[in-house]
């Protein structure tokens, strides 16, 4: 890596030049092969990196600086275009390798289906895993028009793997009636519309447990994040989402990995969504990687 590459927009700002000593690995999952509405999230990771050079390295929320954190931006996993299953397998294998080295995986999507293989890898390492999920949508379908590999199915797959009672979804305001009924019947926690106050109630219950945090950027209202594939009105503000990340960071839960997905730059004409996403990623790195 060139000396100035950490500030070039080619990697996330302040990335270290070598991975061996890094505590966290930032990586992209540029896949949007199964989106049901507007594609383009495969370009999300690269745009988030590009705009990250506009960030300050210091977080006044957490009183911590990226200079204090040893993380490495590994770039994007070279996923085979149009091949969902092979792409998911490659993601799982890569995250397995990160976890084997004792490093924190911080992923960038890509559509939300990319979280599924990451969760599988996390669950192998941490069988007591719980998931904190921020999203506009339930993502609890069994399939989408007969296809089980869809960005509308990852949380259903995760819930069936680790147990619905170990999945906590926040900000949900869209989904099929059957999805909400399945969650209720199976003991899954869904907080409709709201995020911060319900999260505060849940976090003490997860104290000491390994947790994976997945954020779909469309949990934000389209006024705050227009650059995503499936916008849904009535969402939360970026201030509320940042406060939620900080609430997790200051809690007693043991965050072991995280991702942020569904940034689609083609619909993000002012780069508002990518800029918001890059700040959230900075806060997750500084807040979750101890």
UniProtKB/Swiss-Prot annotation:
Pathway: Amine and polyamine biosynthesis; putrescine biosynthesis via agmatine pathway; putrescine from agmatine: step 1/1
Top-rank lineage group of the source organism: Bacteria
Coiled coil: none
One Gene Ontology term of the molecular function aspect: metal ion binding
Key words, A-Z: Hydrolase, Manganese, Metal-binding, Polyamine biosynthesis, Putrescine biosynthesis, Spermidine biosynthesis
Group of enzyme by EC: hydrolase
A Pfam family assignment: Arginase
GO BP annotation list: putrescine biosynthetic process from arginine, via agmatine; spermidine biosynthetic process
Residues holding Mn(2+): 112, 135, 137, 139, 216, 218
Catalyzed reactions per annotation: agmatine + H2O = urea + putrescine
Record carries keyword Magnesium: no
EC number: 3.5.3.11
Cofactor(s) demanded: Mn(2+)
Keyword Iron found: no
InterPro entries to which the protein is assigned, alphabetical: Agmatinase-rel, Ureohydrolase, Ureohydrolase_dom_sf, Ureohydrolase_Mn_BS
Protein task: Catalyzes the formation of putrescine from agmatine.
Family recorded in the similarity comment: Belongs to the arginase family. Agmatinase subfamily.
Name this polypeptide is given: Agmatinase
Lineage: Bacteria, Bacillati, Bacillota, Bacilli, Bacillales
